[in-house]
Swiss-Prot record:
It comes from the Bacteria. The keyword Hydrolase does not apply. Signal peptide: none annotated. Pfam families: Ribosomal_L36. GO terms for biological process: translation. It comes from Nocardioides sp. (strain ATCC BAA-499 / JS614). This is Large ribosomal subunit protein bL36.
Amino acid sequence: MKVKPSVKPICDKCKVIRRHGRVMVICENPRHKQRQG
């Protein structure tokens, strides 16, 4: 899980979602997981 000030989809499998008011990227590739904060 990468924590970044701005999250962007890296590949076409990445999805940007909101969970508990946090913007996150979920993907098949675990290295693409990101959370804003």
